[in-house]
Amino acid sequence: MKTLKYWIGAAAVWVLTACSGGADYERVLPKDAAAVATVDLKAMAAKAGLQNSEGQVAMNRLADLLKSGLTDSENLIDRIVADPDESGLSLKDRLYLFVEKRSVSAGVLMRVTDEDKLTDLLEMLKEQGVCEALRESDGCTWTVMGKMLIAYNEDAFLLVMDPSGRNAGDMQHSAAKWLRQKREDSFAETEDYQSIQDAKGDISVWASMALLPERAIYPLTMGGSAELKGEDVKALATMNFETGKLVCDVRSLTTDKVMMKVAEEYFNATSPVKGDHLDDFPANTFGWSTLSVDGAKLYKWLNSNPAVKRMFEHSMIPLDFHAIFSAVKGDVSFTVTNPLYGDYILLADVVSTDFLQTVEDLKPMIAMTGGQMRLMNRGEHAYEFYMMDGSVLNMRPGPVHVWFGVKDGKMYFTNRENLVERKVLGLSMKNTEWGKEVEGKRVFSVVNFISLMQTVSSTLRKQQMPPVFIGLDRLDRMTVEMREEDKMVHMELLFKDRNRNVLEQMTALVNLTTGK
């Protein structure tokens, strides 16, 4: 507990106090890394407004947190808070996090500015019982801190752990090898590393499918092809903290031919969204997602994968999936109206109602369940289905109650009957600021946090609200879209306060939640 408390507090103080080029510490990054993230501590500290009064209050509280867990350490902690360079680590250079191929190890990399000061810091931690005694071998100094290995030399600092729980000391030779390696033998000499640098994000994350164990890749690719190379299926996410919003962009860097062909065939089965479903729900709807598909092409694309094809062919419910998919052509949307109770409705533009015959064909089979399942007509092209225990069909245990059918040219599927006939009184989603951005996108999703808080406050008393809602109450909405022109995924998390950087607002929130 003392170790965890120290590193949580220390990480926060380092980030908050960071305000010189030098040794080539990036050469330590393993060449076979399957994921690499970089954090611009200097830029984030400036955006957090730590030079103002709120920032100073946050720093003092975090320093107090450290002091409470480490006795007789007040002087050193005060020196580090006053001057981060006293830690011996650079808080002006980027911090790196990495994960090796197949997740055999994960680590943090920082630049060392003063090896002696870093040694003093670790000696103090050793006296506090936080880490073991320092040892020197293979050209580096190292120690063990719980399940983590710390190793460093005059250029670089490594904190390494094995997600599977391997003994920390067993990783010393790998860490020493990375600390000794030349730049040409590291991840820093790859095109993917350059992509991270070119992105210039406050936080940038590069990852490939090689991050996953072999046993996890097959289900994700659904048995698509043995020719797929996981290390060539990769993406880069860039996050920036801006005034009033957090912005994240994700783009594919995939070069694997198998996956590129899969993606191309998927895009051939989809098209830009028309936005026809925006008028179906009020402006304060909690959550909504949409895309536009050619159902017949999508079904063909799905069936090109052997695992998915088997799933359709051996479904526990004998439906004509080809007929259902082929009826869909146009916008498809999924709406969550009440997040606390999970109320939802799926809508899809259809060109025919003929596919409902496959539902009628189920009636003899359902009649043989002795009332365990019931399928009832509720008007023209309208059905109600009830099942006493969903686990019979590998669904969640307990009663399952849904309504589905076709109405006004749209197929619907919902767990709340009143959503079928719901009318919009007043402004619809189309009248919102974000509603004007939907048309033409490949995918568009929105989460309305103002609506969420209205639902929560009308359902729960203030004393019943989890602490997380204190933060959520400061949010406006989150939108996620895939643009037609570059197929890049763009996400924005908007705060209610549009006049301050979101990191500065987070600093104020820390003061609020930790205040006495």
Each language-model region and where it sits:
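An internal, short helix-loop-strand segment that often contains or flanks glycine-aspartate motifs
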Residues: 55-61, 65-93, 125-243, 314-318, ...
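Sec-dependent bacterial lipoprotein signal peptides
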Residues: 1-17
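Structural boundary/hinge residues at secondary-structure and domain interfaces
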Residues: 19-131, 136-144, 186-343, 357-372, ...
